[in-house]
């Protein structure tokens, strides 16, 4: 929209009410998945102006043989979520296999800002291993997970905000989030 209408303003909202999905359960894996989630809300204003984040490209990665690792099923009692312990390994394997494409053929160290959705500590560890990153590369993601939890789609926006407050203009970035499928949504960007 803003490319065809330079004066346009597009408001993007991420509103997640994860606590609505809590259910009474004695299943430890289910309880642990509830414990990392939190409610959250984020907003971004997309304009044609050269300020904030310049969007350089988008990519979706569907990781094969992972369909049942993250699922949402609507039941009479509400949403039933499955969050398998196999998610981190699948993310590491899938990202590693496509690492060169994800970072545009450059080495991972050429990316200055990593805005990775902190689905959990082990997910962040898996991303670090997939790209050979040092622990500091995902410090903003770890801080958001520690301070706010996993707010589903809003979480990566919190990470972007943290990075942009501290980042230098022109820094190259890679943002990514994970979800059912198992899928990874990836955005190349520059701080402007």
Q: What is the predicted role of each segment?
A:
Residues 22-93, 97, 101, 178, ...:
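Condensing-enzyme catalytic core mediating Claisen C-C bond formation in acyl metabolism
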Residues 3-5, 13, 36:
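Conserved beta-strand/loop scaffold segments within soluble protein domains that form the structured core
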Residues 1-9, 46-53:
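Secondary-structure boundary elements
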Residues 18-20, 55, 182-185:
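Short glycine/serine/threonine-rich phosphate/pyrophosphate-binding segments
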Residues 9, 42, 172:
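Residues at the starts of beta-strands that form the adenosine-phosphate
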Residues 9-32, 59-76, 121-129, 150-158:
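Active-site-adjacent elements of ketosynthase-type condensing enzymes
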Residues 1-6, 92, 108, 112-192:
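Claisen-condensing/thiolase-fold acyl-transfer catalytic domains that form or cleave C-C bonds
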